[in-house]
């Protein structure tokens, strides 16, 4: 799988993300989760990742991308009718959502939808909704290069170095 942002070059024991609930996830944990995802779902699948504002959500988004699959990143509390509309339009092969306190999956479950698999562009890294409030089913498509460029822009703007800690 693609080692986006050189995650494999970080100390696997170093904390990659932590949240206000005290959950800490290491770089090694994210890579292990990506391997778990990669070995358990069809390659280049569309995965709706319904996230809460927590470390588990960050880990799942990263793991789905690192495993070579494409997440549509949505708020876990997206209105039911909007979510159903998005599922009808985009027909994801999997849906990941917060459901369990399982420490191996950081409080999220991944379930197959049984929608047929279809070809996704090889450059597509992830999808984001254009707006959470209008109910529009339109999505913004992002490429792998966009992630690297955004990370570089952010690190340049804030003059971040590898010695800086995000928390």
In which residue ranges do the predicted regions lie?
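A short N-terminal helical cap/helix-turn-helix that marks the beginning
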Residues: 1-15, 125
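Conserved AMP-binding/adenylate-forming core of the ANL superfamily
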Residues: 10-41, 83-84, 142-145
């Amino acid at each position: 799988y693609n080692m986006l942002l050189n995650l494999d070059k970080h100390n696997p024991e170093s904390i990659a993300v932590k949240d206000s609930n005290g959950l800490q996830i290491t770089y090694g944990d994210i890579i292990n989760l990506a391997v778990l995802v990669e070995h358990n779902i069809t390659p280049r699948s569309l995965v709706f990742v319904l996230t809460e504002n927590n470390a588990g959500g960050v880990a799942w988004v990263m793991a789905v991308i690192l495993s070579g699959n494409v997440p549509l990143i949505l708020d876990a509390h997206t209105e039911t009718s909007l979510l159903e509309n998005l599922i009808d339009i985009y027909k994801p092969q999997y849906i990941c959502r917060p459901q369990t306190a399982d420490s191996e999956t950081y409080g999220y479950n991944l379930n197959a939808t049984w929608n047929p698999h279809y070809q996704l562009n090889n450059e597509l890294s992830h999808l984001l909704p254009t707006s959470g409030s209008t109910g529009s089913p339109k999505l913004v498509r992002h490429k792998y290069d966009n992630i690297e460029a955004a990370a570089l822009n952010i690190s340049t703007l804030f003059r971040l170095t590898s010695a800086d800690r995000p928390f």
